[in-house]
């Protein structure tokens, strides 16, 4: 199974400056035991690059290399955005909508998010 991780999961999962939540540890353990692949969406790099905490941003970006990226993810057009009733009032919305659209179009089987 291909599991897409939301940015709000990636940051605490890879932030070495805080104690890892047990649910995140369980996610990593079970995905490895069951041979599930954890993915990130390429647009999530934009989200992480906007992190105001420079040290955390540097750490998380360096650790993203351990995840597979969705190759050639579907890009949400303005028309599809309107048809699906999504709003994109800021950069975060754009990234979130494209992550959801990748799931919608079958680029991953499951999205893990804290939203």
Features from the language model and the residues they span:
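Short, well-structured N-terminal submotif of metal-dependent ribonuclease cores
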Residues: 1-40, 50-59
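Short C-terminal domain-edge/linker segments immediately following a structured domain
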Residues: 33-37, 68-73
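Amphipathic alpha-helical interface surfaces
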Residues: 44, 56-60, 95, 99
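Active-site neighborhoods of divalent-metal-dependent phosphate/nucleic-acid chemistry enzymes
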Residues: 69-114
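Nucleic acid-processing catalytic cores of prokaryotic defense/repair systems
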Residues: 47-50, 80
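Histidine- and aromatic-rich ligand-binding microenvironments
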Residues: 5-6, 39-42, 92-96, 115
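Residue-level signal for well-ordered alpha-helical scaffold segments within enzymatic catalytic domains
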Residues: 12, 47, 102-105
């Amino acid at each position: 199974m291909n599991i897409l991780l939301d940015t709000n999961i990636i940051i605490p999962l890879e932030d070495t400056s805080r104690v890892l939540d047990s649910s995140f540890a369980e996610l990593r353990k079970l995905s490895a035991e069951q041979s599930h692949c954890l993915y990130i969406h390429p647009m999530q790099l934009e989200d992480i690059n906007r992190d105001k905490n420079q040290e955390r941003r540097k750490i998380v970006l360096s650790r993203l290399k351990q995840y597979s990226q969705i190759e050639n993810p579907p890009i949400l057009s303005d028309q599809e955005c309107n048809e699906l009733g999504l709003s994109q009032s800021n950069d975060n919305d754009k990234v979130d909508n494209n992550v959801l659209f990748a799931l919608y179009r079958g680029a991953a089987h499951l999205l893990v998010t804290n939203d």
